[in-house]
Amino acid sequence: MTALTLLVLSSLMLAACSGQAEQTNEKTRTITHEAGKTKVPEHPKKVVALEYSFVDALDELGITPVGIAQENKTDVSGLLGKDIAFTEVGTRQQPNLEVISSLQPDLIIGDFNRHKGIYKQLQEIAPTIILKSRNATYEENIDSFKTIAEAVGKTKQMDDRLALHEERLNAAKKKVDPNDDRKVMVGVFRADSLTAHGETSFDGELLEKIGIENAVTKTAEPTVTITLEQMVKWDPDVIFMAEADPKLLKEWKNNPLWNQITAVKNGEVYEVNRDLWTRYRGLDAAEQIVDEAIQLLQQK
C-alpha cells in the first residue's frame, strides 16, 4: 500500500468520523405525534410536507418546504396566494418516496389518514411526524399546527398567529345574528354521491365556533357519504355546495325530493370553492371561510 493510498484512506476515515460526530452532536427535540415519538433536529432546514394544511402551517411560521405533495400544478400557489420554489414529491395520495429521499430532508410531515401506512418507510428516509389533517376536526388541525411549530422551533410565532386567529374569529362571531336559527350543510357533490361535512368536520366545527349551526349531527365520522333521502331528513336551511358534479346534481334536481329541502325552497344553495372550504384546512383558509359564510348568510 503506497503512502498516497494511506493518506487518502485516512482522510476518508477522518471525514466519516467527523460527519458522525457532527450528527451525534446535533441537538434534537422529541416530538409526540399520532404514530409515536420522533427525535427531530432542533432547527430543521429541509422539510417535506405531504398535506396542504402542513404547507400552510410552515408558511405561517416563515418556513418554505423543500418538497411538497400536490395533485395539480396550481394547488400550492392557490393555497398560499403566491408562488414558492419547491420540488413536487408526488401526490398527497401517493407520495414518491424516491424523490423525497433525493431531497435529503431532515423532517417529513405526513397525514394520519393518508400516510400512517408508510410511516416506517418515511422514517427510514428522515425523522417523520404523523399528524391529523384530512377528515379531522378544526381543533385537531389546530393541534397539528401547534405540533409543527414545536417541531421546527417556532412556538413564539405560533402563539402570535393563534392569538391573531382567535381575534379574527371573535370579530366574525360578533357579525353572526344570535337569533338566526338557520342550520347549514357543507356538501361535496361527487360523480355518484354527496359527502356531507358534519358538525365535527373542519369547516363544520369552525362554523359552529362562530355560532353557525350544522344540520348534520351525531355522525360517526366528521364527513359522511349520504343519499338524497338522508339529505331530506337532515333538511338543511342553507347548503354550501363545495363542488357540484353536474351529473349527480342534475339527477337530484330532477327528483321531487330535492325540492322538499328547505334550502332549495328558499333559494339558499350557494356554490363555494372546494379547495378553500374542504382541502386547505389552514388558519388563513379558516378565516376566509367564516368571512364568506357570514357574507352569504347575510344576503337573506
PLM regions with names:
Residues 51-99:
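A short, structured surface patch at a secondary-structure boundary
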Residues 117-189, 276-300:
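Extracytoplasmic substrate-binding proteins
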Residues 238-300:
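Structured C-terminal subdomain patch of bacterial secreted/periplasmic proteins
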Residues 104-109, 127, 231, 235-239:
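Proline-aspartate-enriched helix->loop->beta-strand connector
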Residues 2-3, 15-53, 156-184, 244, ...:
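Bacterial Sec-exported substrate-binding components of ABC uptake systems
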Residues 39-44, 81-88, 210-220:
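A local structural motif
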Residues 33-35, 89-97, 219-228:
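Short helix-initiation/N-cap motifs at beta->coil->alpha
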Residues 73-78, 195-224:
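Alpha-helical, coiled-coil/dimerization segments enriched in small aliphatic residues
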